[in-house]
Amino acid sequence: MVTERSGRNVKEVRYQPGENTLAPVQTLIKAAGQGRYEFSSRRFSIGGRDLVGWEKAERQSLTLVLLADVSHSTHPYINVMAEIINSLTGYFRMNKDRIGLISLSGAQAQILNHPTHNYRVVTKSLLSLAVHGQTPLADGMQKALAMIRLQKHRSPGSSSLVIALTDCYPEPLTLHSPDPFDEPAYRETVRAAKLFRKDKVPLLLINPTFSHHQEKDYFPGEKLSAAIERESGGRLIKLYRNMEFAQTQPSQGIPPSHRDILRIISGVEEMVGSRRLGEDRRIAG
């Protein structure tokens, strides 16, 4: 009566020990329907052929797409993302997950790795990324969605998750308006965020450049981060800048603190785990 299969019950089948899980209630209902219940003795007459089992859904595989911003402010966190992938390799391999990587650098986002089981190649690509000024955020988000759609077409039962590490200062800018949110790069990013909700693709956004706790004081990148979270139905991890370091080393990215690393690990593990269980509540509606 023990089976290694996990997942939700999807179909009643003939019970086979080791192949499926015994369904006691369904067995009794079937027996009663076949006249195997005696009212006088209040007993069922059940044989081996009458046993009903549950066929389980196969464990869901996950397609994880990483969006990596390689500006000065976010580049110090690239190593953290590579270490997280390495630490979860066994878990990913057990579930036959795929990981893809998109670099937010240059005029257009660059697809460095299509979703693959070769996690070492992905971490190697991550660690090879160099600092680059431009951040084509909207293009990267759209390419991540295209990756997910293609993978869902190939594996209809698979789950998905996009993790974006970015300071949310999209480019290029026209500089024709005093309000950054009138810039095409900002408008297109918000439009791309709405597509995540429409497609029911969960998004974990990690912004390591927050300076303000009050929304009224937000810089444009902080405002855009909040807008992406709101419009996509995803989750935002705000990591606050070490202002003392920023003032003494203005040209360098601020290295992540131990607390920052723990928050990133916790957020990634939570989102990956929730997708494994097929929990779509955060992006419903």
Regions found by a protein language model. Give the residues of each.
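Flexible beta-alpha connector loops of hexameric P-loop NTPases
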Residues: 76, 127-136, 177-183
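Von Willebrand factor
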Residues: 28, 57-116, 118-160, 170-171, 210, ...
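Short hinge/gating elements
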Residues: 4-17, 68-73, 108-110, 126-127
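Switch/connector loops and helix/strand junctions flanking conserved nucleotide-binding motifs
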Residues: 107-113, 154, 170-175, 212-217, ...
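Acidic/polar low-complexity segments with low predicted structural confidence
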Residues: 1-61
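Von Willebrand factor type A / integrin I
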Residues: 146-159, 180-285
